[in-house]
């Protein structure tokens, strides 16, 4: 069993105290109790853990550690984080990112480049934010992967980003036709499946 999170955007809305309280309530009252009740010991985060690319507010960082990260460590959760575009400082590389600078556990697995990860015999292709630095490796991984499932923080053409506004940048949906399931960030609340895509709610 694997828990999935994405687009948590710690520090959103200008580090709004109201949003911090709202997010904390979700983790304390819903998310972590669910992991315990269902004996889930693995978490995959599909990217955009934090909100700002350039910096993080001290209170937001403190809250992230106290409410989220310390609890993952307390429960001994095997944590995998796929870097999203909001997690990375530069636009052309994922190598300078918030997660590697927040002093989180050395046991956490952070993915800045495509990688195939095995969970109890099932291979899953992880695809972090595709940028100049990892573009060729990402395309090669997509084209040559033998996995049936891909997870990532993807920009794909043709999905509705906002009502009436369809994304015209990124990869073509057809590039993922080989996969039985592709799990990525939520785009359109009315479009749960599209050419094999399972769109994950934020």
Predicted features, each with a name:
Residues 8, 12-116, 179-198:
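Core catalytic region of metal-dependent phosphoesterases/phosphodiesterases
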Residues 1-3:
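Extreme N-terminal starter segment of soluble prokaryotic enzymes
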Residues 6-9, 154:
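Short, small-residue-rich loop/turn micro-motifs
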Residues 87-178:
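Conserved catalytic scaffold of divalent metal-dependent phosphoesterases
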């Amino acid at each position: 069993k694997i828990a999935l999170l994405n687009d948590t955007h710690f520090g959103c809305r200008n580090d709004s105290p109201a949003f911090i309280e709202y997010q904390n309530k979700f983790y304390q009252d819903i998310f972590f109790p669910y992991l315990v009740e269902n004996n889930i010991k693995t978490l995959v985060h599909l990217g955009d853990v934090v909100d700002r690319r350039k910096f993080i507010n001290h209170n937001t960082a403190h809250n992230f550690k106290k409410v989220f990260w310390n609890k993952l460590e307390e429960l001994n959760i095997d944590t995998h984080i796929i870097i999203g575009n909001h997690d990375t400082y530069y636009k052309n590389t994922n190598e300078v990112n918030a997660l590697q600078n927040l002093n989180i556990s050395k046991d956490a697995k952070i993915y800045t480049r495509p990688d195939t990860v095995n969970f109890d015999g099932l291979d899953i292709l992880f695809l972090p934010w595709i940028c100049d630095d990892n573009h060729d490796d990402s395309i090669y991984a997509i084209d040559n992967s033998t996995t049936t499932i891909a997870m990532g923080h993807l920009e794909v053409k043709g999905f509705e980003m906002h009502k009436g506004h369809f994304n015209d940048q990124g990869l073509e949906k057809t590039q993922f036709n080989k996969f039985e399931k592709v799990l990525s960030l939520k785009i359109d609340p009315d479009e749960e499946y599209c050419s094999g895509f399972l769109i994950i709610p934020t």
